[in-house]
């Protein structure tokens, strides 16, 4: 069975993160980094639909965002080493699909969406892209099969490429 999930999750901590992202409640960058790590802990280990439970059942787990996203996003304001230490205990996936897209194009796509979250600013996204590069370099040779995909291609083409790489 294929189990598709995301971070932040729909759990209590994930919902709190979403409220912070939408600027409904204030939080320091360090608090946000800790909340992502806490949400990830629940996501991985809590309950019958946790990532580890699904993996133990033999399911294929696909998650939209994981510790690599934390390293890219939270490192902008907290520093890479701080965020890495928070996320170091988490297991690495077999595969990572990184959708590489120019921040200017991403910003253009976001402009049609209306309300943006606190990270969806062009200047911030350019810094995030630099930390994604650092993160990918850091995990090269770690055993994670890293797939860098052109994020400017249509979603259908990206889906086709990802499914081909998963060898379902």
Predicted feature residues:
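ATP-dependent small-molecule kinase phosphotransfer cores
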Residues: 2-84
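A glycine- and Lys/Arg-enriched "phosphate-lid" helix/loop adjacent to the NTP-binding pocket
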Residues: 65, 69-131
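NTP-dependent small-molecule kinase module
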Residues: 104-168
């Amino acid at each position: 069975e294929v189990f598709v999930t995301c971070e932040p999750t729909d759990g209590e901590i994930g919902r709190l993160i979403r409220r912070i992202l939408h600027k409904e409640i204030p939080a320091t960058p360090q608090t946000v980094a800790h909340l992502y790590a806490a949400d990830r802990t629940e996501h991985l280990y809590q309950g019958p639909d946790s990532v580890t439970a699904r993996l133990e059942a033999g399911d294929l787990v696909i998650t939209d965002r994981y510790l690599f996203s934390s390293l890219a996003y939270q490192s902008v304001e907290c520093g890479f080493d701080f965020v890495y230490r928070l996320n170091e205990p988490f297991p690495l996936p077999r595969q990572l699909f990184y959708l590489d897209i120019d921040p200017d194009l991403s910003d253009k796509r976001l402009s049609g969406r209306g309300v943006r979250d606190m990270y969806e600013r062009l200047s911030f996204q350019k810094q995030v892209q630099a930390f994604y590069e650092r993160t990918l370099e850091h995990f090269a040779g770690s055993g994670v099969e890293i797939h860098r995909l052109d994020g400017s291609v249509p979603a259908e083409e990206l889906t086709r490429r990802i499914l081909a790489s998963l060898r379902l």
